[in-house]
């Protein structure tokens, strides 16, 4: 059993304020660098079909935000890279580990994307290690993100294989049911898992899943994440690709997991479910609100930039943050 170290999740933690050193939260710098590029926020929308399509990816890149295009339109990936590069934008795509993906990666030499994410549910695998090595051999200048993992051993192995960043999180997301279907994962202790993995990491960690509030972004950074991948908070916007559905006169958008039957089109090895989210406004409004909330967090930390969040004290409050208000 691994409970020798503290096990906690986002709602169990409160960060402790420090003396504020800026006149206004607007002075706080929320930017973060990953590889050779700097982005406005340390967040990335989940590379899922109901979160982004090519239009959303383009909007994010133009706005100075990091994005990772999903891997479920395989034939469209090379034209997508070209279209992004033609506009002077970064190309960031996902690959799997099936045999044909090796040929695909080799075809990218002529127009290599800046970022490739190797994206499988259980990323601590020989198949992922060999794909990392293949990408690094074929496209040495491409930044490789590999995942998903949930242990320090996995982080070290993927880094040693050549990964430039690792993605941590096994099934903590709102539409992921891996924890229920298999009994495995970081659901319920995702924040502690990120901390455990970050202590072993020499390269950036991307915390993936379980984010329910903007404050969770600051908490992720406190416990070692360089970037935070977010699904449900980015789903359901006007620009989101999910179908809009009307129920009793109210607008909802569908949001489903990457291993759900809705995405797979077949009921086989299903580890994702579909939910309806109340339709939100524009994606940019959420990004702006996230930026302002993170600026406030930096000011509470007594800092001026994102990295200052890494040094604040915290308490473990065991689920009492909402004071019994379960509606959150």
Swiss-Prot record:
CDD domains, alphabetized: IMPDH
Example of a GO biological process term: purine nucleotide metabolic process
Enzyme class at the top of the EC tree: oxidoreductase
Active site: 176
Enzyme Commission number(s) from the entry: 1.7.1.7
A Pfam family: IMPDH
Keyword field contains NADP: yes
Top-rank lineage group of the source organism: Bacteria
Keywords: NADP, Oxidoreductase
Binding site for NADP(+): 205-228
Any one GO MF annotation of this record: GMP reductase activity
Catalytic activity: IMP + NH4(+) + NADP(+) = GMP + NADPH + 2 H(+)
Keyword Oxidoreductase: yes
Record InterPro entries: Aldolase_TIM, GMP_reductase, GuaC_type_2, IMP_DH/GMP_Rdtase_CS, IMP_DH_GMPRt
A cellular component annotation (GO) from this entry: GMP reductase complex
Family of this protein: Belongs to the IMPDH/GMPR family. GuaC type 2 subfamily.
The protein's name: GMP reductase
Organism ancestry: Bacteria, Bacillati, Bacillota, Bacilli, Lactobacillales
Chain's gene name: guaC
């Amino acid at each position: 059993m691994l409970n020798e170290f503290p096990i906690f999740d986002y709602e169990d933690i409160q960060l402790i304020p420090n003396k504020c050193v800026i006149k206004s939260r607007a002075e706080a710098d929320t930017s973060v660098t990953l590889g050779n590029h700097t982005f406005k926020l340390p967040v990335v929308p989940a590379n899922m079909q109901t979160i982004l399509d090519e239009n959303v990816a383009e909007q994010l890149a133009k706005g100075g935000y990091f994005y990772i295009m999903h891997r479920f339109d395989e034939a469209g990936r090379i034209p997508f890279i070209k279209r992004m590069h033609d506009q002077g934008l970064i190309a960031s795509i996902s690959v799997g580990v099936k045999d044909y993906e090796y040929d695909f990666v080799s075809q990218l030499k002529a127009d290599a994307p800046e970022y490739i994410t190797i994206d499988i549910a259980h990323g601590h695998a020989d198949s992922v290690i060999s794909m990392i090595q293949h990408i690094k051999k074929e496209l040495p200048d491409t930044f490789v993100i590999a995942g998903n993992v949930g242990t320090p051993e996995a982080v070290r192995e993927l880094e040693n294989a050549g990964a430039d960043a690792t993605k941590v999180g096994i099934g903590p997301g709102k539409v992921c049911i891996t924890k229920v279907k298999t009994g495995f994962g970081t659901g319920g202790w995702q924040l502690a898992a990120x901390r455990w993995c970050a202590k072993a990491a020499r390269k950036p960690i991307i915390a993936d899943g379980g984010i329910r509030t903007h404050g969770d972004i600051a908490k992720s950074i406190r416990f070692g994440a360089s970037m935070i991948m977010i699904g449900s908070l980015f789903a359901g916007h006007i620009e989101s690709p999910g179908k809009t559905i009307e129920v009793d006169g109210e607008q909802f958008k569908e949001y489903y997991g990457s291993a759900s039957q809705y995405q797979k089109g077949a009921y086989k090895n299903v580890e994702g479910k579909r939910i309806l989210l109340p339709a939100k406004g524009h994606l940019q409004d959420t990004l702006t609100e996230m930026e302002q909330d993170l600026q406030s967090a930096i000011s509470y930390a007594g800092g001026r930039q994102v990295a200052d969040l890494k040094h604040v004290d915290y308490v473990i409050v065991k689920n009492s943050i909402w004071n019994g208000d379960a509606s959150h």
